[in-house]
Every structure is written in C-alpha cells, then in structure tokens.
Amino acid sequence: MIKNINISNLIRACVVIMVLMMVSCEKYLDKAPEATITDQEVFGTFKSFQGFVEEMYHCIVDYTRSTYVDDWNIADEILATTVDWRMNVHFDDGDYWYWYTTATGWNQSYLYKDEGAITEIGTQQEWTMKGLWPLSWYGIRKANIGLANLDKLVEATQEEKDIIEGQLLFFRGFFHHQLMTFWGGLPYINEVLGSEKLDLPRLSYRETALLAAEDLEAAAALLPADWDNTAAGQATLGNNEQRVTKSTAYAYLGKDLLYAASPLMNKESTGNASYDEELCKRAAEAFYNCLYLSHTGQAFYQLTEWDRYHETFYTLNGEIPGYPESLMTPRYYYNEIGYDVTTSLHHPRILGGDGNMISPAHSYVKNFGMANGLPIDADGSGYDPADPWTGRDPRFYESIVYDGVQMIQGGTDADDFKRYANLYNGGNYRDDLGGSRTGYMLKKLYPNEGNNVDAVPNKLMLPGYMRLADVYYMYAEAVLYGYGTPQSSYPGNAGYVLTAEDAVNIVRARANVPGVDARYLGSQEAFKDEIIRERAVELMCEANIRFCDLRRWMIHKEMKYREKTALDFDRGPAGKPINMVERIVVTRVVEDKHYWLPLPQDQVTIYPEFGQNPGW
C-alpha cells in the first residue's frame, strides 16, 4: 500500500533534514478502507503513474503569490513601503529569520508555510498555502517513492517508462537544487526513508550538487525534447509547454554545476573563493546542449520576440505567460484570474493599489545602460545627467516607469490629474507610505493599463524560474571561467560555435542593443562586469536570481550593492527633472552569515550533528 506523505509529520519528523522523514505507518492516499487502492493500480499504467507525477509540478511554488502583497525581491532591486512587516524590509535589516517566522504571525515568505497553514499537503490549487521549503522536501520524497515503484509500471511503452523515470529524476535533482541555493549543502535523499534513526550526513555544497547533477543528467537522457512530438504526449497535445523536457533538465544541470563552481559555493566546499574551472566546463557543456536543441529546432524554446517581450511575464488575453522562452514556471490556477494580486505591488493608491507597492531603487536602475550598449558611466555613453531617461537601453522602457510616463490610456478629463506618472517630489504618485519611495515604478511584470481607470481584463502575471535568456548568460559565465576568455566557446558541434561574447550579444540583440563594447572584451574581469550588469537588467525581479547571484559571486557585502537609493527631483518647466539629488534610503545589513539563510532552529536542535549555518 502507498504510504502517506503528511506535511505535518514531515516537518516534525525531519530532524534536520527538515521535513524529510515521514511516519511510516501513515497511508499515502487518505482514503476510507473501502476506497483503498493498490500500488499496482497507482503505478501500473502510464496514465495512473503520470497522475502520481503530476503532483510534483504543483510543488513548484509561485514565488509572486505567497500573499496578495508578496515580497520575493530580497536583494538590492526594490524598496518596499515603510511598513515594518514587509519581508523585504526585514531582509534589508539583516533579519533573515523572517523567511521562516514573522513577528506579526503572518508569514509573507514564499519560502515557507507552516504546517498549520498548509491544507492537506499544500499542493492543491491554493497558491498562498505553498512554501518552497516544505514542498521541496515533499517533492523529493514523492520522487523517491515513484522511483522505488518503477518496476510496477508494466502497462507502458518504453517511451512512456523513460518519460516517467526522467520526470522523477529531474524533480529529485531540481528540488535539492532549490534548497541548496538558499541553505547550502544538505543530505542528498535518494531513497524512501523510514522511521529508523536518522544519521544521514550533511554534505558540502559541491557533494550535494554533484549528486543532483547525476539525477539531472540522467533525466536529460530520458526526457523528450518536445512532448508534442511523442506518442505519450498526444493525449495532451498543445498543452505540454509547462512540462519538463530534455532542455529543462540540461538547463538545470548547467545551473546546478555553475552554482557549485561559483566563488561562494567553491569556498564552502574547498576553501578556494574562485571559480572551479572543471565544473565550469561541465556547466558549459550542459548549457550548450540545451541551446543546441533550440538552435536545431528539436526544442520549441526560443527568445520571445521583442514586440511581445512582455508576454514572457504577463499577458492581456488570459493565456499563460512564458511561451516560448520559459523553461520552468509554476502552475497557474485559473481561479486566480478574477483576483488581481499584482495591482497592490505595482501601483500606488491613486491608481488602485492598496498602499503596499514596491518601487525600483535608483541605485539599481543605474544598471540600465544606453541604447548604444554602453553603461551610463562609460566614456562615450551619451548619458546626460540632466536628462537621465532619454536614450536608454530599450529594456529600461519595458521595465521601469519614470516621471511623466502615461499610465492611463482611457478615462475622461476628470482622470487627467493622475493620467501621467507624477513621480517628482510632492507628486501624487510619490508617497513613502502608499506610493513610490524612489521616483520609479516597476513596469516589467505588470501592464501600466492595469489601473483603476483602464482596468484591462484577463491580465495574468507569471514570471518563471528560468528562461532561455538566463541560459545564454549562464553559458557565457561558464565558458568565461571554464575556457578563459570572452572569445572562448564550448567545443561542441562544428556547425554551432557559440562564444561567451556571442551568448550575451544574442540576448542584447533581441532588444536591438549593440554587442558588448570592445573595451569589455579584453579580460575575464571586464567581461564579468558586463555579465553582472546584463543579468541585473534582463533578469530583474525574477525568482530571486539577483539574491543568489550577489551571494554566489561573493559581492553581497560590497557597499554598491548594499545601499538602496531614491532620486529626489522637481519637475522643470520643460517636463524634465531638475534639482536632482540621489538619497540613500536604506543600507542593507550584510555580514558573512548572510551568505546563507538560517536553518529552522527547532529542527536543528533535534539533530545537533547536522549543525546550523555559520553565524546563526
């Protein structure tokens, strides 16, 4: 009989592996005795086994919807309003315990939901009940149960067996990777644990990552490049875009290895705070394999065309965002369409928000360069401090609302007082308590027309965990530190040579931005600086990529990434800003201990040998 995965028992029984161990006498399916089904009925056919696997897709947390005013940006991108219960505020203050518990009793973190908040197993269609921490452990156990029962899959073709096994291996590696990125090396759980005494060792980051890499590499060999081109995928033809594929597995294999190769993780594992060259080469190979599938048309993933760029993050027609660029997104539940959880984050009260908006920090906005491809502080960039929003990188205009941008398209003359973004000092969009604190608003993830006048219908926001642009950047980084120069490439197929420089330029070209200037192509350090800036521009506010980047590069403590600033200014007669002053609003508290999140103390003390993360 299948064993129960009960999240309450899972969290308590887990000693420090936190939530891994389950009470073995629980039944997996909470059925009445007369409704009991056998293992063979669950695992015997492709259709029934795939139903078992489907739940793991629902363990992928939508990081934008932990609450109706979710704070997932915990690095240097944004400033929240001045209320003290925001997760962003606590992380700025160095209070990383806030991921796990809050003084207000209201857990705002997508990383954790306590056992009392999770209905049943927390994988049902209730996005506010999902937490990355418990559901990752749950997903790992579920994958192990599936792998332990593969021998029961008898009514299936070899293709169907491969697809089932590939998904199970992928999710086991993926969920371990999700946990590692925040909490470091962990035990790698590759079997179904019982109720016996727990003595699994905590591994180094490298050791954990290499075990995840084995699973992800095996998954890549088994999964299809495109489900629509398989017999198994015909039953869901045209609705397979969010399923994991060969490309997804290669992309996460590369990410897993690149993270393990990065300075922070390499130092934790070996004491050496530089890149691990061999792991970078392995990462480059995995990313290359992912990109090659798209290059040859075997996989459907492509960079979204520029005129549809916003559809990577939100749509206005009720369709799920992301296609064809996103490789990994959470599930979207259609009962959410009528509940607009994003207005409060993106718009001030005057446009229909509830006073809980986030605003991009001016210090972060300075990452956006000029239309000629140069950083704003580079010689010859053409940046004019007296006219700071003219001639910028096209991605600036897709991502940022600045003073004077038209927000309301319709309405009447009575709406003219708020038709344009009044973000100057004293403007009706500028308010520390209910509007912009910085002089900017975030446009990237939400349409300007999603206001209380235009009120565009059917707007869906769903930024994913990984998209193809990220793969290009990570490939460039892996090649740079695996093979030595921006002009280096992974030695793959002779018909597809891709240098590190090429990979970055492909993403820039999508936005009509010229290639990286020659002055940044002469050394690893110069090109790395452009990779850092490019990732800040292209991947802003996506899946805590920035938080992970700053930490893994070990630049988290540098003052330029700790100071969050606002731009104070008046609006001049010509509509241009005057009397501009950059003001430090927050200096983020970052010490050595802030390279990792603390582990739940109540669970660490149950298993002292496991150990808390340093400094916590």
Model-predicted segments: where are they?
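Bacterial N-terminal signal peptides that target proteins for export
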Residues: 2-14
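C-terminal motif of bacterial Sec signal peptides marking the signal peptidase cleavage site
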Residues: 22-24
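Conserved, well-structured interaction surfaces
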Residues: 46-51, 58-64, 91-183, 197-232, ...
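Short coil/turn linking the two alpha-helices of tandem helical-hairpin repeats
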Residues: 178-182, 187, 227, 259-268, ...
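C-terminal substrate/ligand-recognition segments
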Residues: 119-121, 126, 389-507
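An aromatic- and glycine-enriched ligand-binding surface/loop that stacks and positions planar moieties
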Residues: 26-106, 186, 243-427, 558-574, ...
